[in-house]
């Protein structure tokens, strides 16, 4: 039954789809935008580890390069597997209906070979950087593909929470490529922040694409419980996110203050915006700031970690 629905949805979505260059097909199959954002998260964890251990960047250059390329391949593989499994609901949603696995420009069998190949190569490269990095790479890949994509995404309103654990693994990969101390407050804080950030971010996407998720029967929180419940739950996560900023106290008060201020601005925008805007405009505001939050915080962490030893 699922196969029949997939075939019908893909056929309907591919009728008027223009041809694409192979590089574009590959990019969309592997989700290069997600690869880039996750590499930034990985770099934040790696930079923190260099700072905490006091190891000069030059001494770990091979490990750094293996971690970068290994992470990119594993994250790309996760994107390929997700595209294969979700092609039926992707065909229904406007933002995903032109993905190569939907239009037929990338056949599922080819995407599967690509995903498996990149998984093996990526994990091998991470293993050269550090066995712990490879372990986290495998864990992140598994959590994203199986508990999230194949199970919770279509079954529960807590799919975002379940998926957030796998989505927060890249900083752990970067850290583990350099340091074996997995209980340091800095990396715990970075992991917690990355987990918590995802709920307000993806709730905002779910509101902006409410009709599409509803049509695809994906039980996102706003679709099942409504906007008010989503607003309340968003603010709860933002309060906890602000509190989690204090994980960085032992590392740097500067990073702590940056993380705290960003969280409080986000919370203020949420409360003030909800009172003045209709839900989709509020969600757009939340979505845009979520991107700024993570980009600014990770950039500050990377800059602080790499530049502080020079002074």
UniProtKB/Swiss-Prot annotation:
Q: Which residue ranges does UniProt annotate as crossing the membrane?
A: 39-59, 61-81, 111-131, 133-153, 162-182, 187-207, 246-266, 287-307
Report disulfide bridges, numbered on this chain: none
Q: Which domain of life is it from?
A: Bacteria
Q: Which Pfam families match?
A: UbiA (PF01040)
Q: What is the annotated role of this protein in its UniProt record?
A: Converts heme B (protoheme IX) to heme O by substitution of the vinyl group on carbon 2 of heme B porphyrin ring with a hydroxyethyl farnesyl side group.
Task: Provide the family line.
Answer: Belongs to the UbiA prenyltransferase family. Protoheme IX farnesyltransferase subfamily.
Q: What is this protein called?
A: Protoheme IX farnesyltransferase
Source organism? Shouchella clausii (strain KSM-K16)
Q: What is the lineage of its organism?
A: Bacteria, Bacillati, Bacillota, Bacilli, Bacillales
Which gene holds the coding sequence for this protein?
ctaB
